[in-house]
Each structure stands twice: as structure tokens, then as C-alpha cells.
């Protein structure tokens, strides 16, 4: 970095020093874009010298983490460039990358990165002239955006007051109704064990505090009397199914409506087999988060879903359930209004909001531990050759960790909100996850709870949108 660039990066005031020039990192495909850049050089085409290239075998190998690292290390802009669709030397690498970067681009805009800083282009080996043109346009765009905002905590900033969330939530159940559901649940769990349908039942047991429950693993029918049900049943029990299957061929799991998406996701991704599970869906009154209902419950009906094997309600236990009404499934999420409000704010205000959120992160990784779909044997944050995500509690590292975790869950997140619930710093991880879910649904449709459908970001279509690609 030049002295002017260092000064601009540290100031965070939005002013542009007189001698400032943008630093741009280009992640390029070896077979096409790198060759196109080489052709531009050998034919002596002139273009700005602000770009530093990093060569990859394929755009499909370019992780969004590398873009984040470029910004973290002081780049003012990033260009990603590869082969045209249909020309990939690895057949479909750029098609998968196109979907991935479509969603990642939306997230970067949401957290306050001006999209003038982030560009994508198809440049073939024979398009030296296009490479020179793209670099010129990207440089001008980043120059207009100015120095990258500081990752530091925005001291003296009053923050943003988000709109209040509203929603009716599930049907209210009185104490007698909850007791009836609990008794029916105990009966169903006992019959599952005595009938040999499963070797273990994962449910909720009494905790050490009032209105608190803990995960309970039952292998004897007599212990089913310990099962509890109510608004203190917060945990997503699908997190524990994998370890239980290490000891038993089949496992039964008690599931709220919001837990079913995680179960479907684990089956979809080959982490579980449907025949290994007995899913006990229970009529849910919503769970408490402090004095009121949890955010995720405000737009939930609490009804079980046909993915369940057994359905427990006030009226008893039955082997299957009717499909909830389309209206119940399509109820707007209570967080959507807050997301829409954030999107109306200028980029710098959004950036300050999220930097303040990420600045509180303790790097305890409770979000990772609670998430049913964070199942990698070695997380990217634990890999240190090289150390992709800084482990210290600093602002660039905190931002990279929280953003890349959300990206890894894009198109997969079930919306159970366990990450936000267990976060000791109260970071609004649920807003990021919900924003990505909305964008995936808008671009590629909704997969719902069908475990046979592919996740959007491991699939592609030749006709996928690419209006943002140069």
C-alpha cells in the first residue's frame, strides 16, 4: 500500500486523499481470463495498472472467503473473472460459481459493501481487448467508490433502530392442553421404544431452571415419563441425531415445526438416511425467548408437517399428518420488514451497523456448535495452513468469520435461529440468514422440506441470471 492508501484505510471518514489510487485484486481463471490478460499484454494494449492478479484453475475453485480476505487485507475492489458459460475446461465450474457469486454479491450489498467495489466478468483467452476494457471500467468504478471503509468499531455512532416485529404466532395452548400433549408424547415415545421402531428417543427433559429444558436421550420406555413439552423446549434436537446414530441403528427425534427443515437438510446432504429416523412431530405453542415469543415463532403456525412419522397433538397420536395449508406455509416472516428497512439505508450506514454487530463477536463459536448444518469435521476457522480466518477477536477477522459462515449456509439454512439464540453477544445472525434465504428463493425458487430436491447452490441452469456479469 502507498502512504495515501494507508491513510485512507485508517481514516474511515469517507474523504479521498489527493494521491489515492485504488488497489484492486483480480481472481482469474487460468485457462481463459489469465490468458486473455496475457494477450492484452503481448498486444501492448494499455489499461490501468491498479489490478493485481491471482490465478486459479477455475472460477469454481474461487471461494467467497478469498474475496473477503482481499477486502480484509486492504483491497479497495475485487474482480472475479473466468470462462464464458459453456467454455469451462472443467465443464460446469463457472456455472456453479455463477450461482454462488450471485448470492454472495447480494449479501455484500446487504452488509454495506458498495457493489462498485465488486465485479464479475467473462473473459476468454482470445479477448485481450475485453480484458483491457473490463479493467478500465472496474478501476473507474472503484475509484468512484473511494477507499474501502474501515473495519473498526464505529465509535460515537448511535446505531439504527429497527422496526418492531409483529406476528400472531402459533395457536395459544393453555396448561391443560400442554399437559395433554406432554402425556401423548410420552405415550408415543414409549410405544416407539417398546415396539422396536428405534433404539433411542431424543426429546426434552427438565432443566435446572424454571421454564428451561435440556436435550434428553432415552433408551428405556420407563424413562419416557421424564419427557417434557412446552415453551421452554428451545433446542433444535436434530443437532444430536448424528451422534445418537453412532450407537443405535434407528433413532426417534422429537421435532418442532422449525426443526424439520434441518432434518430435511441433513437427509438431502447425505448426513442422515430417512430410514434411520422416526420423526415425532409435536403441535408447538411457540418457544419463549425472554418475556415473549421467539422471533421465528411470530410467523409460524406450529403445525407438524407430512415429513413426520408420528404426530402428537392435544387430541392424541396419529401415524401421519395432513399437509398444512398453503397460507400457513407462505406466511411472511416477521424479520422481512427489518431486512427491507436496512436495505433502504445508505451503504455506509449499513456497513456501520454490521461492523458494530460483528465487533461484539467473542469468537466462542456457539453459533457453529448449535447449528445442525455446521457438521464439517474441521471448520475453515480451525484450519491454519494457511490461516484463512484470523482467530483473534478483531474486527476484520470477526467480519470474515460471520460472513463466511452465513455464505456456507446460503440455500441450506432451515431458519431454526439456533445460532442467534445461543449467541452471547446477541448478534443479529438471523437477519443475515433470512436475507440469504430470501435471495435464494427469489433467484432459484423454494425447495421447502423435500429432502429429494437439491440445494440451490449445488445446482445450476444454463439460463441462470447473470445481468451483473461484465
Regions found by a protein language model. Name each.
Residues 261, 369, 430:
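Glycine-centered loop/turn positions within well-structured domains
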Residues 23, 294-297, 358-364, 368, ...:
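Residues immediately within or flanking Cys/His clusters that coordinate Zn2+
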Residues 108-110, 335-359, 373-470:
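Ferredoxin-type iron-sulfur electron-transfer modules in oxidoreductases and energy-metabolism complexes
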Residues 1-354, 358, 372:
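Iron-sulfur-associated redox domains of electron-transfer enzymes in respiratory
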Amino acid at each position: 500500500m502507498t502512504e495515501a492508501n494507508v491513510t485512507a484505510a485508517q481514516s474511515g471518514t469517507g474523504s479521498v486523499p489527493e494521491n489515492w489510487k485504488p488497489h484492486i485484486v483480480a481472481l482469474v481463471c487460468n485457462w481463459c481470463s489469465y490468458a486473455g490478460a496475457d494477450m492484452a499484454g503481448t498486444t501492448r494494449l494499455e489499461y490501468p495498472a491498479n489490478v493485481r492478479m491471482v490465478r486459479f484453475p477455475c472460477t469454481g475453485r474461487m471461494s467467497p472467503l478469498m474475496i473477503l480476505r482481499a477486502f480484509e487485507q486492504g483491497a479497495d475492489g475485487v474482480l472475479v473473472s473466468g470462462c464464458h458459460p459453456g467454455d469451462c475446461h472443467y465443464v460446469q465450474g463457472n456455472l456453479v460459481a455463477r450461482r454462488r457469486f450471485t448470492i454472495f454479491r447480494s449479501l455484500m450489498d446487504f452488509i454495506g459493501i458498495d457493489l462498485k467495489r465488486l465485479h464479475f466478468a467473462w473473459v476468454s483467452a482470445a479477448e485481450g481487448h475485453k480484458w483491457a476494457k473490463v479493467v478500465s471500467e472496474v478501476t473507474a468504478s472503484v475509484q468512484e467508490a473511494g477507499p474501502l471503509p474501515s473495519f473498526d468499531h464505529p465509535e460515537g455512532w448511535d446505531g439504527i433502530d429497527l422496526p418492531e416485529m409483529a406476528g400472531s404466532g402459533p395457536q395459544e395452548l393453555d396448561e391443560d392442553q400442554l399437559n395433554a400433549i406432554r402425556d401423548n408424547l410420552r405415550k408415543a415415545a414409549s410405544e416407539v421404544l417398546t415396539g422396536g421402531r428405534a433404539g433411542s428417543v431424543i426429546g426434552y427433559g427438565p432443566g435446572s431452571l424454571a421454564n428451561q429444558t435440556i436435550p434428553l436421550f432415552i433408551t428405556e420406555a420407563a424413562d419416557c415419563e421424564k419427557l417434557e413439552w412446552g415453551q421452554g423446549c428451545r433446542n433444535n434436537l436434530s443437532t444430536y441425531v448424528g451422534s445418537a446414530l453412532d450407537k443405535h441403528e434407528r433413532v426417534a427425534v422429537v421435532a418442532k415445526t422449525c426443526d424439520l427443515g434441518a432434518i430435511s437438510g441433513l437427509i438431502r446432504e447425505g448426513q442422515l438416511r430417512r430410514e434411520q429416523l422416526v420423526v415425532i412431530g409435536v403441535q408447538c405453542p411457540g418457544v419463549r425467548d425472554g418475556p415473549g415469543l421467539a422471533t421465528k415463532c411470530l410467523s409460524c403456525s406450529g403445525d407438524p408437517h407430512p415429513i413426520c412419522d408420528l404426530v402428537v397433538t392435544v387430541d392424541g397420536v396419529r401415524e401421519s399428518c395432513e399437509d398444512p395449508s398453503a397460507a400457513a406455509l407462505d406466511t411472511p416472516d416477521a424479520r422481512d420488514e427489518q431486512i427491507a428497512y436496512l436495505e433502504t439505508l445508505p451503504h455506509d450506514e449499513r456497513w456501520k451497523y454490521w461492523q458494530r454487530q460483528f465487533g461484539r463477536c467473542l469468537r466462542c463459536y456457539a453459533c457453529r456448535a448449535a447449528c445442525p448444518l455446521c457438521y464439517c469435521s474441521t471448520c475453515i476457522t480451525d484450519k491454519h495452513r494457511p490461516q484463512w480466518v484470523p482467530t483473534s477477536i478483531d474486527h476484520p477477522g470477526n467480519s470474515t468469520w460471520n460472513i463466511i459462515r452465513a455464505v456456507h449456509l446460503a440455500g441450506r439454512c432451515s431458519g431454526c435461529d439456533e445460532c442467534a439464540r445461543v449467541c452471547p453477544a446477541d448478534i443479529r445472525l438471523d437477519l443475515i440468514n433470512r436475507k440469504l434465504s430470501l435471495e435464494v428463493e427469489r433467484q432459484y425458487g423454494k425447495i421447502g422440506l423435500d429432502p429429494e430436491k437439491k440445494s440451490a447452490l449445488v445446482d445450476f441452469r444454463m439460463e441462470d441470471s447473470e445481468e451483473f456479469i461484465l
